[in-house]
């Protein structure tokens, strides 16, 4: 039976209901600082922790609960006669429940505060108490999540106690929380790209219906610190997002964020099927749609500008899973909401420079994100691209980096007319892209040409300019073909493999 509880919380949500319930069952409540004041002002009978420890709060609140009279009461094993004898001799009363949530370091680390101010939000007393309570979960109930209050109240009402299964789960939540909390602090202090231990701090956002396929369970976790597009978006309409939806939305959003110009990306199965830039949202959607009239069906469409009513009306004509944009005109949103299953996503955060991670069996690969488009751009052929061709070449290179390797993109007037990707050799990717395009002006490749065959194939389809990293031992073969066919070719010096 719970006879004594210690309550010390930063987040006061639900704490009055819990405290008043405990009080109604004659539980003695000990509290600290702001929590003590909050409970007392709201009519809860509460004991200041100083009355228990006989020691005042000190060092600007850094030392409040770090005291044997507190931790002895938490850690004493009730059925250990020696433990109980010691705490009785020392005048220590057992503490049966610990209710603590931590200083909000996750939030404060991203605020415009000085380094020293952020350090002050590293909680010490709270973690020490909850770790102690979690270790002794057979005798102590520990609550760190406001969502657990109601369940614990119900169990006590029904059984006069909290069952051991619940206690164990609550203890597990402590160490789960602390691993994320400590990871955030560690990353803040270390500021290392590749630390000795990789500790990640993510919190479950939602349980997903399933993973890539219906037989796979899944959940979505978001970073506890920082602002990121796939963390801070807002769903304005439609069904719940799926595992595949979120993966696809991420790539579609990253693609349109590559461009300063008005841009649209249509995407299916994590691969762009239509990308375009232009002067208006309606123009770029029309161009992206025309890139691939078939594949866009059931796909995702992303914009880097606000969507207007005219564009929304056109979007509503076909089946789409998601439309994502920085914002939507009110009348545009009304149109899209008529399709109750269409997920309409408002995403204002730009795609961020950071790291990419890939899980393998027994490890995680970590790398810097591919945020560098060009290295040492130079024309390597007798003929140079025109100004418009050069614009299309750069556009093509921005698109091709989001297509699975081997990847080729054929472009005409700011429109990715043909996209070939995921092929095990480059010539197949080129043939796929050229065939899909039908006609095009320039061709972009994510990696160098190992032979002259891609240039030969491009010439057959009337390509006028090519952009590729260069660096093959047979570069001269491709250069020779281009010179013979009157094609200009640009080397960028940087590769964009995507696996």
Curated annotation (Swiss-Prot):
Keywords from the UniProt entry: Hydrolase, Multifunctional enzyme, Purine biosynthesis, Transferase
PROSITE patterns the UniProt entry points to: MGS
Domain of life: Bacteria
SUPFAM superfamilies: Cytidine deaminase-like, Methylglyoxal synthase-like
GO CC list: cytosol
MGS-like domain segment(s): 1-144
Reactions the enzyme catalyzes: (6R)-10-formyltetrahydrofolate + 5-amino-1-(5-phospho-beta-D-ribosyl)imidazole-4-carboxamide = 5-formamido-1-(5-phospho-D-ribosyl)imidazole-4-carboxamide + (6S)-5,6,7,8-tetrahydrofolate; IMP + H2O = 5-formamido-1-(5-phospho-D-ribosyl)imidazole-4-carboxamide
Pfam entry (one): AICARFT_IMPCHas
Enzyme Commission number(s): 2.1.2.3, 3.5.4.10
GO molecular function: IMP cyclohydrolase activity; phosphoribosylaminoimidazolecarboxamide formyltransferase activity
Gene3D superfamilies assigned to the protein according to its UniProt record, in alphabetical order: 3.40.140.20, Methylglyoxal synthase-like domain (3.40.50.1380)
Associated pathway: Purine metabolism; IMP biosynthesis via de novo pathway; 5-formamido-1-(5-phospho-D-ribosyl)imidazole-4-carboxamide from 5-amino-1-(5-phospho-D-ribosyl)imidazole-4-carboxamide (10-formyl THF route): step 1/1; Purine metabolism; IMP biosynthesis via de novo pathway; IMP from 5-formamido-1-(5-phospho-D-ribosyl)imidazole-4-carboxamide: step 1/1
InterPro entries: AICAR_Tfase_dup_dom_sf, Cytidine_deaminase-like, MGS-like_dom, MGS-like_dom_sf, PurH-like
Transmembrane segments: none
GO biological process: 'de novo' IMP biosynthetic process
Family under the similarity heading: Belongs to the PurH family.
Notes on the domains: The IMP cyclohydrolase activity resides in the N-terminal region.
Protein name, UniProt field: Bifunctional purine biosynthesis protein PurH
Encoding gene, per UniProt annotation: purH
